[in-house]
Amino acid sequence: MEKIHVLLVEDEQTLAMIIKDTLEEQDFIITTAGDGEEGLRKFFEQKPDVLVADVMMPRMDGFEMVRRIRQSDKATPVLFLTARSAINDVVKGFELGANDYLKKPFGMQELIVRLKALMHKAFVEKEITNTYTCLLYTSDAAD
């Protein structure tokens, strides 16, 4: 299986480095960004497999960044990783298009498992779409 490319958008540099180092030990490829504006730019430049984003950041928060991403990309899995734990924040995150929401503090093993689950789900969805497309093509060719 190919390595998973994660775009990590986190303004706390120490936490970002800990996450980066831990995920790289698990064979993930990590790109980091320190705020939502940089994250938005890197997302469209690099097309990561999954986006992990804090919510509270300078210049552009994670909610706004994901809202803008979802205008043109609805497929890339998004996991919010944030201290914003109020139910209205969680609901807002999912309404904006997040696939998962992990509250700080969190365990690294939980983050790893959630990322792998998101990628597995994305892979299965892509396979289903490809199979459906092939079936449509086969059906059209038979007519």
Predicted regions and their residues:
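Short, Lys/Arg-enriched segments at the junction into DNA-binding effector domains
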Residues: 4-5, 117-139
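Conserved acidic carboxylate
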Residues: 10
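Charged docking surfaces used in two-component/phosphorelay signaling
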Residues: 17-25
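Short hydrophobic/Thr-rich beta-strand motif most characteristic of the beta2 strand and flanking loop
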Residues: 27-34, 42
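Acidic catalytic/metal-coordinating carboxylates
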Residues: 35-38, 61-64
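Active-site beta3 strand of CheY-like receiver
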Residues: 46-52
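Receiver (REC) domain active-site loop signature in two-component systems and cognate sites
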Residues: 55-57
